[in-house]
């Protein structure tokens, strides 16, 4: 899962780090600079590519200070999620766009080149969008509601007002997720119809689920849990307070101020890349 809701400066720091570890190897001749986008809402790793959800549409990072526009559809990408090779998005249409306002949920099976309407056209604007397997959680900015789909967004249930700043979907069991609510973690096994508080050694700011376990940031350290948050182990301390945690099953990235650290062994060791 990647969840980035920080300033433009921090997003650019994340992008620089991803380039440094050579996730991408494209020519910058076909790209636009970061200055062509007013601001970023989302940064997501999709396979071996890095996607940027911006005010001007969806872009792919192609070099340290360059990106290229994906597809011809321009919209303000507020929510972005990837499940396998399918990209899901939500947001607002640009002027002159044929998309509904708000967009609802749209999906692309060819990495953003073309989009199809999935559901909630003109009804939902998801700013938080997280998914795994066939499940998607979305926080609609208009109503303030947390919504849940068990069939890749085709139909939805309204859970209630959203109380969470981040959600990690656990794909091993339908309806299971762990979320950050204030200073607490909560676990659900029925898509937040009910939930229980997980006792943790500290308050977490961001949370990610990979094949190696559940990862979270707190204070100056990265923590890992191998039992769905019941117990935690501090695995990597940093000199300073980490700001961003982004991970897939191959790579994990943590920023500390202007420094970027990358791990290829599930957070056990990190290498400073800039």
Language-model-derived ranges and their functions:
Residues 1-9:
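N-terminal secretory signal peptides that target proteins for export/translocation
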Residues 3, 21-24:
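Compositionally biased, low-complexity segments
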Residues 8-11, 18, 26-274:
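Extracellular glycan-interacting surfaces
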